[in-house]
Amino acid sequence: MRVLIIVCIFGAATLGGCAESKDTTSSFDMSEYRKIMERQKHEQAAVESTESSAPKLSPEEEERAGDTEAQRRNFPMAGLHYTKAVNAEPTRNSARLKLGQLMLQQGLFDAAVTQFKDVLTRDPNSAVAHQGIAQAYLQQGKLQEAEAALTKAIALDPSSWVSQNLLGLVYDQQQRHSDAIAAYKAALAIRPREPNVLNNLGLAYALSGDHETAIQFFEQALAAGSNSPKLHNNLGVAYAHRERYVDALESFKKAMDEPRAYNNLGVALLRMGNARVALVCFEKAIELNPQYYEKASENLRQAQKTLSQSNGKTISQSTEAVSCP
């Protein structure tokens, strides 16, 4: 979230593949985290057996040790040091904020909210704490609460592009795409050429039906240095909506293997009503990889069903040639 930018996925796809997605920070794998924590319980027991002869760290030193472990991406040990810091000095807000951010990254949202609210009891004007609470609520789907927390965070720190970006995510989930666009533009006014925000702005335009403008912002995100598979996928979907099928396929290929790229193009076409060409794309995906996962076969059956219901005619009249790029 670095300052975290929470992942925000919109809606479960009814077909396999091609889901548009917000560009965000991946959360720490919780199952793996638990394994690490269990292993480090034993390691810590060995460490504690020698602590009696080792100098005890001050809260400040524990926090610095946590920072070092966080930079190494050793998150369980970082959390251990931050916890020791706040246990020794409960009013140490800086360590508590870091502990809350770490909990956010690990998906421990209720625990993170507890840490941030504890900070607010001593510093009600902590924009970082309000932002952290909003991030947790957003992940939990508590959109009204997230919006309220972000409104406070932005009022306290209008220079936070992260809060503006998060507010855009909230608005998009509330289907308030025009408000989301305004929030993303406010974020870009603070931090121009931020790839994550450019991607999110492009997707907000796509969700509102303006795929041409969406393409412009997706391409700007690429030009700004992003090579995210999610971005390439979003751009591919937008290209497909503008009937730029060759460009769409090439964009999908940058995000995934070739069979999956054909499957995703087929999904986009089927959703747009062009079942006839979608069917050919699904067949191509299976041809390239006969063992291609069940999604392509399921999508192929869906395309065949749609064609059968339309008496074998393409629903969309935009593409006459029955071929997939």
Residue ranges and their predicted role:
Residues 59, 93-94, 127-128, 161-162, ...:
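Helix-start (N-cap) detector for alpha-helical repeat units in TPR-like alpha-solenoids
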